[in-house]
Swiss-Prot record:
Region listing for Disordered, in residue ranges: 193-240
Keyword check for Transcription: yes
Alphabetized GO MF terms: sequence-specific DNA binding
Compartments, record wording: Nucleus
Feature type site, description Determines DNA-binding specificity: 185
Keyword Translocase in annotation: no
The protein's name in its UniProt record: Homeobox protein siamois
Native organism taxonomy: Eukaryota, Metazoa, Chordata, Craniata, Vertebrata
A GO BP entry: cell differentiation
Amino acid sequence: MTCEAEMEQIVSTALTLQEDYIKFTPRNPTMACHTEIIGVFHDIHPTVEKNKEAHRDKLVLQETLVELYSVLGIPQEPQVGKTMKFEEPEQHRGSARFDPLVNSLQLKRPLYEEERRECKRPLVQADEAVAAPSARSRRRTIYSKEQTHFLQNQFDLNPYPDFVNRCRIAKITAIPEPRIQVWFQNRRARHLPRAATSLSPQERKPPGSVGPRSSLCREAQHPEAWSEVLIPSDSQPHPN
């Protein structure tokens, strides 16, 4: 008895559920499936519906403006070929296009290294070119004792040697002629002023003064001239 009572209760509940299901379901099964799909689509893409509504509003506004311009008599450009396109922004493409890090790594970095290498070369060459004259000017000629002694003896003999004498000294000492010229110039600048200042006032004589020794030398060199000058006036015949 208990089993029959339980079976009757199960059948009655199933029938009641079937009646409720028939009341809430539509008559056309395809419409029910379509509504379910649209509901799911609305839940997944709500922004698409918003974009469509905005697009419809713009189209309505455009149509009203066209009607208003036609009523007012304002000429309009042909709208053929003018279509409004709505595209979603490409975030990844835009970020990659305007990303400075990507551009610097792909394009600018190798170019910067090449420019730096090319710029370093002329700078180094310019530094060498600038350093070369200074290095040349700092070089000093080192003379041996024999060369120095020989040059000093030649300076004592003639402080102002000409080109021929300098070439002769250069051939003997194996020193270039320009170096010999510089050596004599430096030697004159150092020693000749000292020699002039070391003389005593008695030894200094004006250039126009002539001593007895110089007069005797002149007399020895030109005896005829001095004999003509020293002839007394009494030796000449007196006119009558």
